[in-house]
């Protein structure tokens, strides 16, 4: 018989830097899960990623106080800000432009995000990322 799922916990944790401090500790502690076990497993799973990049993770908690987790790719907004060299998006995206991204940068971001996007082909994924860039106040070149 399969284990009974008690909760899905969605968090954004910096790659390779999970520790028992908030938000990880309280979210797992109130479900009775082993916090240090998660931290070690998450840090090992994200060791190949650039340290400090926020990484979404979905933790499945079971009734016997065990868990599994799935990491997603870094949010597109974070990757776009990094590519454009800005710290935040525009407060008025249609009037105030804060930076530029090239078509090549969009393709690289689309390849990173490919598994999490529903786009059937790379071109559609690039258009999705370009839309995110425009909504942040970035100019898309190319």
Curated annotation (Swiss-Prot):
Gene3D superfamilies: Ribosomal protein L11, C-terminal domain (1.10.10.250), Ribosomal protein L11/L12, N-terminal domain (3.30.1550.10). Keywords: Methylation, Ribonucleoprotein, Ribosomal protein, RNA-binding, rRNA-binding. GO terms for biological process: translation. One of its GO terms (cellular component) is cytosolic large ribosomal subunit. Forms part of the ribosomal stalk which helps the ribosome interact with GTP-bound translation factors. PANTHER family: 60S RIBOSOMAL PROTEIN L12, LARGE RIBOSOMAL SUBUNIT PROTEIN UL11M. It holds the Pfam family Ribosomal_L11_N. The keyword rRNA-binding applies. One or more lysine residues are methylated. InterPro entries: Ribosomal_uL11 (IPR000911), Ribosomal_uL11_bac-typ (IPR006519), Ribosomal_uL11_C (IPR020783), Ribosomal_uL11_C_sf (IPR036769), Ribosomal_uL11_CS (IPR020785), Ribosomal_uL11_N (IPR020784), Ribosomal_uL11_N_sf (IPR036796). Part of the ribosomal stalk of the 50S ribosomal subunit. Interacts with L10 and the large rRNA to form the base of the stalk. L10 forms an elongated spine to which L12 dimers bind in a sequential fashion forming a multimeric L10(L12)X complex. GO terms for molecular function: large ribosomal subunit rRNA binding; structural constituent of ribosome. NCBIfam families: L11_bact. This is Large ribosomal subunit protein uL11. PROSITE patterns: RIBOSOMAL_L11. Belongs to the universal ribosomal protein uL11 family. It comes from Xanthomonas euvesicatoria pv. vesicatoria (strain 85-10).
């Amino acid at each position: 018989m399969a284990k009974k799922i008690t909760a899905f916990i969605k968090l954004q944790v910096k790659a390779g830097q999970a520790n028992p401090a908030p938000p990880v500790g309280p979210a797992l502690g109130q479900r009775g899960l082993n916090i240090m076990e998660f931290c070690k497993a998450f840090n090992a799973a994200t060791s190949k990623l650039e340290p400090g990049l926020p990484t979404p993770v979905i933790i499945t908690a079971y009734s016997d106080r065990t868990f599994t987790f799935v990491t997603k790719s870094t949010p597109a907004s974070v990757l776009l800000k990094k590519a454009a060299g800005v710290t935040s998006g525009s407060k008025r995206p249609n009037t105030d432009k804060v930076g530029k991204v090239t078509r090549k940068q969009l393709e690289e971001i689309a390849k990173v995000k490919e598994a999490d996007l529903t786009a059937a082909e790379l071109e559609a994924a690039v258009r999705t990322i370009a839309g995110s860039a425009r909504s942040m106040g970035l100019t898309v070149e190319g």
